[in-house]
């Protein structure tokens, strides 16, 4: 009788312990993830500028923290590494690793809502074509192509809404973006006076390097590449991250607008931008 009572007590003590161990095991397994080197480079810190760590073709890690949309991982129970959270969630989205798949990019479609920006006027029926329409169309194309490369893309606006200037660079600062790029279309005092594309930077260093790298890709556009220039624009001036503003043609010049309005031109610009951003991120990536 006493032996039966003791066994019952023992089981009453062991059951909570076993349940706790099962819960710990389940939580641990839930936070474990397999990392494929072909898809993700593990780094020493939360960003693509940190040096990579040595890794096997396949690693098993446990998520132990998060910073700037990067997961902190414990690899093989001893080594600490970092990886972009958005890539860990779907490693099959991009076949192989590339610099853009580690990058956070803020895309700013200039103007919007009650702020229409510059305009092109068609004198035949006197309709007006607004800058805000074409900056958004271009921004969406660039965003789509960047996401296809695995990049984390944040848009300051994704519809025809008004967004004040000051919050736009704040989005880049808050997300620790690797790149901030703002799209606009230029305008001259008189119609048909100006033509061409210009890339502006405000800060020297990474921002100027970004301007040079992206602008170099515009040499084969149907509009003349006017090069890079210093520009005192709030969205790039009040920006803590690498930031540029691209004027992709004069909207009030008929020759330029005939390009600006076409899907072909927008697609060509988007391809050039993605190529330039990939090159910039490759140059910035920790070695």
Residue map of PLM features:
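Hydrophobic membrane-insertion alpha-helices, especially the h-region
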Residues: 10-28
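A short, glycine/acidic-enriched catalytic loop
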Residues: 116-129, 188-213
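Active-site-adjacent mobile loop/cap segments within catalytic or ligand-binding domains
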Residues: 182, 200, 229-287
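Solvent-exposed loop/turn segments at secondary-structure junctions
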Residues: 111-114, 159-163, 185-190, 204-207, ...
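Active-site-adjacent substrate-binding region
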Residues: 206-229
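Intrinsically disordered, low-complexity Ser/Thr-rich linker and spacer segments
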Residues: 30-32, 36, 44-45, 86-103, ...
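SH3/SH3-like beta-barrel superfamily modules
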Residues: 51-87
């Amino acid at each position: 009788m006493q032996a039966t009572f003791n066994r019952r007590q023992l089981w009453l003590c062991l059951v909570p312990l076993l349940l706790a161990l099962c819960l710990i095991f389940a939580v641990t397994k839930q936070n474990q993830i397999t990392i494929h080197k072909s898809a993700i480079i593990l780094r020493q810190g939360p960003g693509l500028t940190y040096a990579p760590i040595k890794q096997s073709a396949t690693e098993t890690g446990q998520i132990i923290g998060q910073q700037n949309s990067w997961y902190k991982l414990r690899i093989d129970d001893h080594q600490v590494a970092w990886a972009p959270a958005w890539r860990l969630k779907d490693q099959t989205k991009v076949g192989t690793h590339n610099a853009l798949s580690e990058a956070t990019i803020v895309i700013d479609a200039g103007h919007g809502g009650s702020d229409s920006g510059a305009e092109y006027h068609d004198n035949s029926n006197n309709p007006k074509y607004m800058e805000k329409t074409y900056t958004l169309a271009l921004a969406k194309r660039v965003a789509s192509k960047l996401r296809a490369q695995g990049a984390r893309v944040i848009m300051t606006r994704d519809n025809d809404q008004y967004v004040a200037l000051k919050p736009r660079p704040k989005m880049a600062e808050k997300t620790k973006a690797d790149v901030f790029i703002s799209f606009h279309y230029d305008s001259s005092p008189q119609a048909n006076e100006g033509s061409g594309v210009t890339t502006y930077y405000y800060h020297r260093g990474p921002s100027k390097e970004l301007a040079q790298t992206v602008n170099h890709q515009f040499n084969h556009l149907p509009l003349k590449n006017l090069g890079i220039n210093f520009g005192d624009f709030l969205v790039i001036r009040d920006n803590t991250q690498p930031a540029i503003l691209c004027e992709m043609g004069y909207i009030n010049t008929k020759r330029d607008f005939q390009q600006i309005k076409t899907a072909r031109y927008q697609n060509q610009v988007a391809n050039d931008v993605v190529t330039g951003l990939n090159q910039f991120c490759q140059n910035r990536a920790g070695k």
